[in-house]
Amino acid sequence: MRQKGHRHGRTVSPCAGCKLLRRKCVKDSCVFAPYFPAKEPYKFAIVHKIFGASNVNKMLQELSENHRSDAVDSMVYEANARIQDPVYGCVGTISSLHRQLETLQTQLAFAQAELIHIRTLHRIHTKPPPYTASTVTFPSNKDFYSDIDMAVAYTDDAGDFLWSC
């Protein structure tokens, strides 16, 4: 149903809200017009079914204009979720995603623990035999320019040499 008014030689159709409610749409003062265009009637229909036109109107009027678009997007999302899951709505989706996140975090923790275990086993199997001071020969003091005598005392668990002076 088109309005009888003309703008630049063409008829102007009402917004989806006014069309569904069968009322005259004055684009300059209609709170629904910027957010529920005529070419997307399903958006207003689903929001109207779940929240009611009066409640949507009140919610939009209470918000500043820069927050209204986000509010409409949220209402459309919540209305779709309520249609798909009449009992839990979007809370059901949030709970499902939360459980999925917890499962993935648990799997990640197990994978990280397994990686540490494999690295530890690899380090143990590729560890060089421990050296003792008696099996290693060092150059004499005359080969050094200092008075410091250093000897390998032992190796640590990571296979790194520890020196003693």
From Swiss-Prot:
Domain LOB: 13-115
GO MF annotation: an example: transcription cis-regulatory region binding
Subcellular compartments: Nucleus
Induction (UniProt): By cytokinin.
InterPro entries cross-referenced by the UniProt entry: LOB
Tissues where the protein occurs: Expressed in young shoots, roots, stems, leaves and flowers. At the bases of lateral organs formed from vegetative, inflorescence, and floral meristems.
Pfam families from the UniProt entry: LOB
Gene Ontology cellular-component terms listed: nucleus
Coiled-coil stretches: none
Keywords recorded for this protein, A-Z: Nucleus
PANTHER family xrefs: LOB DOMAIN-CONTAINING PROTEIN 3 (PTHR31301:SF58), LOB DOMAIN-CONTAINING PROTEIN 4-RELATED (PTHR31301)
Note: Over-expression of LBD3 induces a dwarf phenotype.
Family affiliation: Belongs to the LOB domain-containing protein family.
Protein name as it appears in the record: LOB domain-containing protein 3
Gene: LBD3
